[in-house]
Amino acid sequence: PPHSSNGHSPQDASTSPIKKKKKPGLLNSNNKEQSELRHGPFYYMKQPLTTDPVDVVPQDGRNDFYCWVCHREGQVLCCELCPRVYHAKCLKLTAEPEGDWFCPECEKITVAECIETQSKAMTMLTTEQLSYLLKFALQKMKQPGTEPFQKPVSLDQHPDYAEYIFHPMDLCTLEKNVKKKMYGCTEAFLADAKWILHNCIIYNGGNHKLTQTAKVIIKICEHEVCVPQTKYFLFVIPKLL
């Protein structure tokens, strides 16, 4: 039967994975702030550094419950800038870091957006050109068979989705964010796109057919946005100048 939403298949007791009921806390709008850098939605202002150990459990409904690397629960490190969480062992850390901790995704985004550290390729891009590049990538990501991921999951059809998924994502939402110019670099766009795969694995399991489709979407995204020097800057961007 056709899939009616992104991230999971129609409810079927024979194929639905067994999931523990643990509902992530709702994001408190009073705690939500937009980062000074255009990381995309659901990122927070950097707080003053402390010497206290970093959070090891999601707090205040600001963080996911599932590790960004292995997509499983457990004791996790919470990023100060985004909702992502990680197992220390998945990051191959020998000890828990002290003070405010920023995840690998946010570190890559910060480096890419900082004037002092961004690549020469990114310095050549205007906001409009970046938007054009990301729109082009999105069109490539909308391959035949990706229809389940092209719109938000219907909570009417899948009412338990919010019990597992902290930050829903789909291609339509990505497109809206691009139009609003919420991404300051290709790394930020890719990091947001990865929520599609992360969510799909959490809800459906790693071996589900939809998860394989989600992996293809992310591979296409990585290819389209990670080789700008050889593609966009040689052929696409010069035409926009």
Stretches with model-predicted labels:
Residues 93-95:
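C-terminal recognition-helix end and immediately following basic linker
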Residues 1-81, 88, 98-241:
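Chromatin reader modules
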